[in-house]
Amino acid sequence: MTTTTTFKGVDPNSRNSSRVLRPPGGGSNFSLGFDEPTEQPVRRNKMASSIFGTPEENPPSWAKSAGAKSSGGREDAESSGPQRRNSSEANSGDFLDLKGEGDVHENVDTDLQASLGQSEEKPVPAAPVPSPVAPAPVPSRRNPPGGKSSLVLG
């Protein structure tokens, strides 16, 4: 007959148990998934970087080769990102009214029409319109990707 070794818990005077109560790294790994704040260990050299984090002491080699400044490179990238996004949102014209505030969009439309009326004297270059592409002709009989169709015609 074979005997198995049993583990003792945290307390050496406790009864024998086949259950491991504490993982090798210390602490408990028992988690029910609620009301337990988990603290992530801070790793100095992690792969993923934070966009808005503190500047690293040793920037990656590609940043040096691109000619980025170690002091002002991040600030420029942070400030230009939201500016581009806001300007594209303001000029796109496709706003979605999720809250039902239609009067805000009417004001935007009247302001837009007023500004267009003032700038009619100046020729505005039109954006190139892509030519419509005719869709590919649909074959009259199509087979599914796996082989023959199971369609029965009588």
Swiss-Prot record:
Biased composition (Pro residues): 125-138
Record region (Disordered): 1-154
Phosphoserine: residues bearing it: 28, 31, 71, 80, 87-88, 92, 131
Keyword annotations from UniProtKB, A to Z: Acetylation, Cytoplasm, Nucleus, Phosphoprotein
Compartmental location: Nucleus; Cytoplasm
Modified sites of kind N-acetylmethionine: 1
Modified residues (N-acetylthreonine): 2
Compositional bias of kind Polar residues: 1-19, 80-91
Free-text function comment from the UniProt entry: Modulates negatively AKT-mediated GSK3B signaling. Induces CTNNB1 'Ser-33' phosphorylation and degradation through the suppression of the inhibitory 'Ser-9' phosphorylation of GSK3B, which represses the function of the APC:CTNNB1:GSK3B complex and the interaction with CDH1/E-cadherin in adherent junctions. Plays a role in the regulation of cell cycle and cell adhesion. Has an inhibitory role on AR-signaling pathway through the induction of receptor proteasomal degradation.
Protein name: Jupiter microtubule associated homolog 1
Species name: Bos taurus (Bovine)
Organism lineage: Eukaryota, Metazoa, Chordata, Craniata, Vertebrata
